[in-house]
């Protein structure tokens, strides 16, 4: 019943999770700061009865606002249930059955898992000294993930470097 490539996956092993409730786990993106006063007020005035209703399935109001902020159209804005879902959907949409997924290493550990779930070739590209890279790192991949800033190195790649990579890469860059 379950695809062979999914059966072959290794289960994710989370890092140590301290039991002390007072510890903020930055490694799992917990935030040491309280929400802003605007968020706190929105939560105080939120009608919990609305949770039983579906939202606008295309999130048009949100997409329009994001488009306005970033100078694009709502049709160019994609909304999902977190970045992991969006990355998984892009892997399905942009990578054919005989395609491949490229990514830098070290980087986000989900990228090779997405390739494995999709049943396509992984194309990891080692970062150079100082965790640097140059374009194109690997132009044979169908889809190439660039994490910016990179995790776990935290290095931020400048806009010009990412744009140069996108211009020379023949596949899709996320």
Regions found by a protein language model. Give the residues of each.
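Conserved PLP-anchoring active-site segment centered on the Schiff-base-forming lysine
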Residues: 93-114, 128
């Amino acid at each position: 019943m379950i695809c062979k490539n999914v059966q072959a996956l290794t289960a994710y092993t989370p890092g140590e999770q301290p039991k002390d409730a007072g510890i903020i786990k930055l490694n799992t993106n917990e935030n040491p700061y309280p929400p802003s006063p605007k968020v706190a007020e929105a939560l105080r005035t939120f009608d919990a009865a609305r949770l039983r209703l579906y939202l606008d399935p295309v999130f048009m109001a949100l997409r329009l606002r994001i488009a306005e902020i970033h100078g694009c159209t709502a049709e160019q804005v994609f909304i999902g249930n977190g970045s992991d879902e969006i990355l998984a959907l892009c892997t399905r949409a942009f990578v054919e059955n005989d395609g491949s997924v490229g990514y830098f290493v070290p980087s986000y550990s989900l990228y090779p898992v997405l390739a494995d779930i999709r049943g396509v070739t992984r194309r990891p590209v080692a970062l150079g000294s100082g965790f640097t890279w140059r374009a194109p790192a690997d132009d044979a991949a169908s889809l190439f993930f660039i994490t910016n800033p990179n995790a776990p190195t935290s290095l931020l790649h400048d806009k010009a470097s990412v744009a140069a990579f996108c211009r020379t890469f023949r596949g899709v860059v996320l």
